[in-house]
Curated annotation (Swiss-Prot):
Signal sequence bounds: 1-22
Prodomain residues: 23-79, 111-163, 194-198
Keyword annotations from UniProtKB, A to Z: Disulfide bond, Knottin, Plant defense, Signal
Entry protein name: Cyclotides mra4/mra5
High-level lineage: Eukaryota, Viridiplantae, Streptophyta, Embryophyta, Tracheophyta
Family: Belongs to the cyclotide family. Bracelet subfamily.
S-S bridge residues: 84-100, 88-102, 93-107, 167-183, 171-185, 176-190
Modifications the protein undergoes after translation, according to the UniProt entry: These are cyclic peptides. The mature peptides contain 3 disulfide bonds each.
Described function: Probably participates in a plant defense mechanism.
InterPro entries cross-referenced by the UniProt entry: Cyclotide (IPR005535), Cyclotide_bracelet_CS (IPR012323), Cyclotide_sf (IPR036146)
One of the GO BP terms on file: defense response
One Pfam family linked to the record: Cyclotide
Domain notes from UniProt: The presence of a 'disulfide through disulfide knot' structurally defines this protein as a knottin.
């Protein structure tokens, strides 16, 4: 009886440790992600798939959300704002239906938008303010992203220097469009009063 308990204990440890160690050698997906994709693709259905069906349909190994999150922390993987509960080592993100995309072998929501300090972006609100200030005559060559993503980007860029009130626009290559409403460029971000706070 004791040997049975020991075998069960070893199997439990292996079940939790092995997926974490092998996460970036194969593709995995969580139950929560499968549920979200199913709800998005068939909103009126209460379909739940068994583990073997998920593996067969997706080509990905089922893993718990806890193990995935622990593995991401241990491997120092960061990308977008929200991990989508799926890796993309060999197989593209199934959660792309939910707005997720692949970065550093992990599917993230907003992973393309988050490194915004590498390209020029502006929020709809900032663009609208600029348009109102100059009578609607402007050519926008910046990528439009949500205010929430822009704010999260400021937090995720640890090397970023704050100075003034962010005007919801970056100025990596293109000057601040929001200069029309009193903003200026500092550390790749347009700020109101950025010169006064230097």
């Amino acid at each position: 009886m004791e040997s049975n308990k020991m075998v069960v204990g070893v199997l439990l440890i292996a079940a939790f440790a092995l997926p974490a160690l092998a996460l970036f050698e194969r593709d995995v997906i969580t139950h929560e992600t499968i549920e979200a994709v199913l709800k998005k693709s068939t909103p009126n259905s209460n379909t739940m798939l068994q583990e073997d069906a998920i593996n067969a349909l997706t080509g990905k190994t089922l893993i718990s959300q806890t193990i995935l999150e622990e593995t991401l922390l241990k491997n120092g993987v960061v990308g977008g704002s929200i991990p989508c509960g799926e890796s993309c080592v060999y197989i593209p993100c199934i959660s792309s239906l939910l707005g997720c995309s692949c970065k550093s072998k992990v599917c993230y929501k907003n992973s393309l938008a988050l490194p915004t300090l590498e390209k020029d972006v502006i929020t709809p609100e900032a663009l609208e303010a600029v348009l109102k200030s100059n009578g609607g005559a402007i050519v926008n060559t910046k990528t439009i992203i949500s205010n929430a993503i822009f704010e999260e980007t400021l937090l995720n860029n640890a090397n970023h220097v704050l100075g003034g009130i962010p005007c919801a626009e970056s100025c990596v290559y293109i000057p601040c469009l929001t200069s029309a409403i009193g903003c200026s460029c500092k550390s790749k971000v347009c700020y109101r009063n950025s010169l006064a706070l230097n």
